[in-house]
């Protein structure tokens, strides 16, 4: 009898653990996410940060909120890596409701907390952004959050980037004559490009100056990095001027490059990013 009671207790505990794992999995994958569309006025930052310091960050596969008071209790611990070799185990939570600029409401998504960053109060990462489409208007500095099925009229001359991983939007770029794979499109990075020293030295284009800058792109801390300004650089066989390249281990295509265009359409449904100017031919 005691054995049967113990066995039943263990079965019950294992059932609870299984249910909890399934719930955490579904929450983490974003199956419950619901988004009310709207327009958001971005701030003065060079990246995709709103006026109330919320970053729409395609370079992050997770979301972050500085306070865990808005969510349900702790779901599980997760290992977070900032891409520069820094790791932290942080708590993951689930929230039913988060509002950005009193315009866009995001419901039922997971986020991490447990550390402070004075640069922003929240990150909306690809666990959420992969469920919606975005249209950026550079002249008005407005980010238009659209439904998953929305698609604007796009000119035939638009610059097109396609990626394969819904959560990690990496592309291949030709910089002058160098083909570089696995460059992450990162709207949380405020430069044009980030590549390592090996590729910087191989580029043939002239660069005008080197300087050292501080960057917050390590997520947990700041670091000093080298910034090189290329007076001219071919990117996918198009010539661009005054390209700001930061020397990092991470390969990034940043928001400064995206904002060189009048409009940017992020098509999450078809894993494609379109960039064009108002005078481009339709």
Model-derived features: positions:
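Pepsin/retropepsin-fold aspartyl endopeptidases
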Residues: 2-282
């Amino acid at each position: 009898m005691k054995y049967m009671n113990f066995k039943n207790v263990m079965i019950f505990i294992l059932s609870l653990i299984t249910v909890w794992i399934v719930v955490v999995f579904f929450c983490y994958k974003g199956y419950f996410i619901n988004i009310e569309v709207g327009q958001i006025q971005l701030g003065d930052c060079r990246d995709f940060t709103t006026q109330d310091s919320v970053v729409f960050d395609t370079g992050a596969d997770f979301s972050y909120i500085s306070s865990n008071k808005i969510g349900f209790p702790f779901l599980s611990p997760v290992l977070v890596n900032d891409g520069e070799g820094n790791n932290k185990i942080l708590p993951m939570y689930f929230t039913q409701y988060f509002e950005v600029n009193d315009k866009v409401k995001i419901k039922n998504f997971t986020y991490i907390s447990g550390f402070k960053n004075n640069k922003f109060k929240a990150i909306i990462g690809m666990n959420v952004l992969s469920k919606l489409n975005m249209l950026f208007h550079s002249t008005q500095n407005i980010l238009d959050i659209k439904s998953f099925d929305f698609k604007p009229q796009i000119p035939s001359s638009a610059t097109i980037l396609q990626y394969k991983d819904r959560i990690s939007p990496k592309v291949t770029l030709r910089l002058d004559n160098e083909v570089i794979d696995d460059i992450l499109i990162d709207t949380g990075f405020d430069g044009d490009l980030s590549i390592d020293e090996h590729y910087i030295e191989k580029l043939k284009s002239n660069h005008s100056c080197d300087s050292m800058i501080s960057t917050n792109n390590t997520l947990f801390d700041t670091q000093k990095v080298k910034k090189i300004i290329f007076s001219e650089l071919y990117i996918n066989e198009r010539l661009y001027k005054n390209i700001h390249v930061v020397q990092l281990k991470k390969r990034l295509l940043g928001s400064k490059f995206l904002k060189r265009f009048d409009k940017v359409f992020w098509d999450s449904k078809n894993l494609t990013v379109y960039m064009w100017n108002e005078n481009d031919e339709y």
